[in-house]
């Protein structure tokens, strides 16, 4: 979709990855060449640019972050199966989902994008990179993926949240890439009551540290990971900068959308039942 009057166009990274070139077709039939401005595999976002927008073409307005609610009607626009300019309607089925990084090698295997929107609006091959709109015509997400065993819509589609557009796209335009914060930790995704007992924790809410990289910001800050043999003894993160953390996804959302490399954050942890505050200076994601 058209992002601004300078001719920047937002799409999915996986749509343009590996392509020698890309062109865009506007609703009036104008077909224009583009140049790649920036791309980010971890969020599956990319920005293209045309030299000048056709007359009458205007950018789509972005919704405010966190304005979407479960049950709200949304409209998906794209080119499913090559059918240009198709629109489909559905509801927001869920919020706070996550998508794995599009990068296939290296340490990025453990990275994921938080805050992803789940919708039952039909999303099929060709919808990728198109906007997900609210009924006010504002962009609330970028259609990215479907959960299906057949490769076509099964009522479970996923869209990158608009907060990622607010946070990441300006960096892609200015410097061609987005630099994420990095702690050097791996966590249990969510803790069940059984996990609480297994790990010897006093509560099940929080992000439990399973391992940390030697020499990482987390290691230098003095955080503790679980014993690899017993699974016990790791720190349980319960708040960051005063914001409660109920699970890893909430911690990941804070890091991805509200922090920057070089920033020092205050992490509240439970260690052997005792509440501690640990200062950690964030690094850059490899």
Model regions and ranges:
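PDZ/PDZ-like domain micro-motif
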Residues: 128-129, 192-198, 212-236
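Serine-dependent protease modules
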Residues: 1-205, 248-256, 262-263, 273, ...
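Conserved PDZ fold ligand-binding element
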Residues: 1, 9-13, 220-248
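Surface-exposed loops/turns
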Residues: 214, 260-261
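Immunoglobulin-like IPT/TIG beta-sandwich domains and homologous Ig-like subdomains
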Residues: 240-243, 254, 258
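Edge beta-strands of extracellular beta-sandwich domains
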Residues: 278-281
């Amino acid at each position: 979709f058209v992002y601004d009057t300078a001719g920047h166009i937002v799409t999915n990274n996986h749509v343009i990855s590996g392509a020698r070139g890309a062109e865009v077709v506007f609703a009036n039939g104008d077909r224009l060449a583009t140049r790649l401005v920036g791309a980010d595999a971890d969020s599956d976002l990319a920005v293209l640019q045309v030299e000048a927008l056709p007359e009458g073409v205007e950018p789509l307005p972005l919704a405010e972050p966190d304005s979407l609610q479960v049950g709200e009607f949304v409209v998906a626009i794209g080119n499913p199966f090559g059918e240009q300019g198709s629109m489909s309607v559905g509801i927001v089925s869920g919020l706070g989902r996550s998508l794995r990084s599009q990068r296939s090698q290296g340490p990025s295997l453990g990275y994921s994008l938080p805050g992803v929107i789940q919708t039952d609006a039909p999303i099929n091959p060709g919808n990728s990179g198109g906007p997900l709109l609210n009924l006010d015509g504002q962009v609330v997400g970028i259609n990215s993926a479907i959960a299906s065993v057949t490769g076509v819509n099964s009522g479970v589609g996923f869209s990158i949240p608009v907060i990622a557009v607010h946070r990441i796209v300006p960096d892609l335009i200015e410097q061609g890439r987005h630099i994420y914060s990095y702690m050097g930790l791996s966590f249990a995704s969510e803790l069940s009551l059984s996990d609480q007992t297994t790990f010897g924790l006093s509560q099940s809410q929080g992000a439990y540290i399973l391992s940390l990289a030697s020499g990482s910001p987390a290691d230098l800050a003095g955080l503790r990971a679980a014993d690899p043999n017993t699974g016990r003894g790791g720190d349980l993160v319960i708040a960051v900068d005063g914001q409660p953390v109920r699970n890893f996804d909430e911690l990941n959302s804070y890091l991805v959308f509200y922090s920057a490399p070089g920033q020092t954050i205050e992490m509240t942890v439970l260690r052997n039942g005792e509440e501690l505050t640990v200062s950690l200076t964030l690094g850059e994601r490899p």
